[in-house]
Amino acid sequence: MSALRNYLNKIKPNFQEGGKLHAFESVFDGFESFLYVPNTTAKSGANIHDAIDSKRIMSFVVIALIPALLFGMYNVGYQNFKAAGTLDAASFIEIFGFGFLAVLPKLLVSYIVGLGIEFAWAQWKHEEIQEGYLVSGIIIPLIIPISTPLWMLALACAFAVIFCKEIFGGTGMNIFNVAVGARMFLFFSYPLAMSGDKVWIAKDSIFGLGNTLPDGFTAATPLGQLAQGGIPDASICDMICGFIPGSIGETSVIAIAIGAVILLWTGIASWKAMGSVFVGGIVMALIFQALGMTPIAWYEHIILGGFCFGAVFMATDPVTSARTEKGKYFYGFFIGAIAVIVRVMNPGYPEGMMLAIFFGNMFAPLIDYCVVQGNISRRAKRAINK
């Protein structure tokens, strides 16, 4: 690494003011700060120095996402071979290899488009490149169906980065989760590509791996089957493990739970917000079930669809979630409850987690305001009573 450090020091003057590559200063600084600790100090304001900076936070979140990503790759291949009836004859390498080749282009498109816009925006505004998209770039491909065309994904990434992040001031200033913005853009712009029975299974072989399925092949998700009053084909064990059709990274409760442990252990995610999402979903599901308004059991609401993934990786986003400690309880409960309400009250679309997180982001500042004003009011009353 010392050789790389020496090389960067050698070419750095070219990117500084007066250098022939000064136009790409932000790009160079972005790569340098990604590889090494920046040799800069704060220019203004009071700053608390800690061992955990934004780069390390993003790195821990990416590590927490890896189990869901790897299992998602395997499940993509698993569903393809299962649909073709050749699962028993396929090896682990064939199944995972097919899934890897199917998911990799989506990861590349997400990062190329998203980081490309961030680099261009930073250079245009003469600002430092932030690390925020390192997480969004991996989450966005994990919350879409495997059949989503790459051009749709590229449009969604561009929309999310520009209109959900950069126009608000960049990383740390956005009020809406970037991945939620991309998912909602796809759902409202291309609803047929985001829902239904034809989007969850990869249908084309890749470099000789996998199987080519008929164009008319369909496979409903267990949540979709339950929403229509049917009986899901998968067992509870398969639902928890993740061997079911669904968005790439949302199917395995176990893989998501591993990520949750990492986020909670490192202190990056708030257990108050995360736990409250599950409590809100369970309470609302029990209410609807008691009223006879849904055939879906409370635990099925939790383990199916994007509920677990959204609760662990998206509702806990420290930038877009509630900041006050008491507010995190209300924020999480609100998201969990709204997710189940949308699922039950909207018969045309069985999922509701992304919309719930969007509304949660919208109301987070109001929740914090109410909590702060409540604290001020109580302190004022105590002062008067004294």
Stretches with model-predicted labels:
Residues 1-107:
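N-terminal signal-anchor module of multipass membrane proteins
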Residues 42-48, 114-125, 162-172, 258-266, ...:
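C-terminal ends of transmembrane helices
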Residues 96-110, 147-156, 239-253, 295-307:
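Structural signature of hydrophobic alpha-helical transmembrane segments
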Residues 113-118, 133-142, 157-164, 255-262, ...:
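Hydrophobic, membrane-inserted alpha-helices
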Residues 128-209:
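Membrane-interface helix-loop-helix junctions at boundaries between adjacent transmembrane segments
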Residues 154, 175-180, 298-306, 328-330, ...:
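Loop-to-transmembrane alpha-helix initiation sites
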Residues 172-257:
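Long hydrophobic alpha-helical segments that form multi-pass transmembrane helix bundles
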Residues 274-325:
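A beta-strand-loop signature enriched in Asp, Gly, Thr, and Trp
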